[in-house]
Amino acid sequence: MHGTTTIETTEIACDRPRASKAPPWQGTRKVAIVSAVRDRREITLQCLRSLDRIESAGLDIETIIVDDGSTDGTCEAIRNTFPETHVIEGSGDLWCSGGNNLGVGHALLDDPDYILVINDDTVFDGRFLQVLVATAEANPRTVVGGLLLLWDEPHRVFQIAPRWDTWYGGWRHLTEQTVWTVPEAPFDVETIVGNCTLFPVAAFREGGLFATKWLPHFGDAEFTPRLRKRGWRLLIDPRARVFNQPNEVPPKMSELSARELYEAVWKKYNHAHNLRNRFMMYWLGAPTKLQGFVGFVIYLVRLALQAIGIRSAPRRERPLREEYE
């Protein structure tokens, strides 16, 4: 059972207190918050407004936004509304992994204690960052992710704790979890979905950066498993709640024209159906390269079967809390 591993925790409530509460650590921890954005001005501003309201006792926070070629006035709006935010302008071809790497590289120059990598389509519970830092302080060599919830259905989990299953054909995602079915204490996972992840600075100095060459998008699917292979622990702290915009569901392959399908699977590296991305996520992120290769082949077989109308039976999903009891 997962519960055989002990996890150090601290008593921090997730609800925003009426008065600022002293953190459980001594002194100040320096945290750089990094987010790569493009052409989502209002969403980015909403994210920054949310960050501006969080509890920051015991924290020295710097926010770094990498704007990769926005044409909707994102840079100007950030500088006018949040002048203390550091904005780095990209060339327009960084994509998500490259943008995050540029921001992380800038953050490393100031030698913070932690780097928090976030998506901009996110709003935050008032105590989330204090919770993440407290858990990281109590558990050395640990990367900590927040509990990702849907902002339009805030009781429902957005994405959490994907598990590698070679014979299923790759990462198996949980889709039916809620705030009532997840564990109450921090719990170990195989990979962390990168919408809100706190890295001790040593994780980047030891493990490198996101794999921009192979995964211009979805770099989190490879980076946190890479750290885990190096002996880092991956935890989700369910008390650190963050609320996310639901993903846009891409059209099914069967709904695409031949040209659209070709571009999706071969040309567009940011597309959910892109096979190159899928292979590299498996090859680099699976427990072993052999498992990654076999998992990818099985994924292709499943695609072929679905194309002729053969689908596997739905699998009952247990409450995640039961697996950690």
Positions of PLM-derived features:
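A short, conserved alpha-helix in the catalytic core of glycosyltransferases
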Residues: 191-192, 196-199, 203-208, 213-240
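Conserved donor NDP-sugar-binding/catalytic core segment of glycosyltransferases
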Residues: 123-165
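Short beta-strand-to-loop acidic/aromatic patch adjacent to the donor-nucleotide binding site
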Residues: 112-121
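Glycine-rich, basic loop-to-helix element that forms the pyrophosphate-binding segment
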Residues: 90-110
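Non-catalytic, C-terminal membrane-associated alpha-helical segments of glycosyltransferases
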Residues: 255-325
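Short, acidic, metal-binding catalytic loop of nucleotide-sugar glycosyltransferases
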Residues: 50-60
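A conserved acidic beta->alpha catalytic loop
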Residues: 50, 67-76, 92
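A conserved hydrophobic helix/loop-capping motif in glycosyltransferases and polysaccharide synthases
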Residues: 31-47, 54, 66
